[in-house]
């Protein structure tokens, strides 16, 4: 005979897979055209010069150069741009 009472069940034990969001190339880093700079939900960062934006708001380089982050405008928005090397 078992000398252990049956353990109760639980409703926990699940979590969603991480989405690996965030900045992939930091300020001053060299990038090639097509390189992903930021993966994000919504426009936490806005596309500046030579930066494209995907349908999921991913920012990517349109030309090669160096990544530059800047805060601009009356709403203090964060912009990402590519400067030619």
From Swiss-Prot:
Residues 1-22 are annotated as: Disordered. Signal peptide: none annotated. Coiled coil: none annotated. GO terms for biological process: translation. The keyword Chaperone does not apply. The keyword Oxidoreductase does not apply. Belongs to the bacterial ribosomal protein bL27 family. One of its GO terms (molecular function) is structural constituent of ribosome. NCBIfam families: L27. It comes from the Bacteria. Keywords: Ribonucleoprotein, Ribosomal protein. HAMAP family: Ribosomal_bL27. This is Large ribosomal subunit protein bL27. GO terms for cellular component: cytosolic large ribosomal subunit. It holds the Pfam family Ribosomal_L27. SUPFAM superfamilies: Ribosomal L27 protein-like (SSF110324). It comes from Vibrio atlanticus (strain LGP32) (Vibrio splendidus (strain Mel32)). InterPro entries: Ribosomal_bL27, Ribosomal_bL27_CS.
């Amino acid at each position: 005979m078992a000398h252990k009472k049956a353990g109760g069940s639980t409703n926990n034990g699940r979590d969603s897979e991480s989405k690996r969001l965030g900045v992939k190339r930091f300020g001053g880093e060299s990038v090639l055209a097509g390189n992903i700079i930021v993966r994000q939900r919504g426009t936490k960062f806005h596309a500046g010069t030579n930066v494209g934006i995907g349908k999921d708001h991913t920012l990517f380089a349109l030309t090669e150069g160096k990544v530059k982050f800047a805060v601009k405008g009356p709403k203090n928005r964060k912009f990402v741009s590519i400067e030619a090397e």
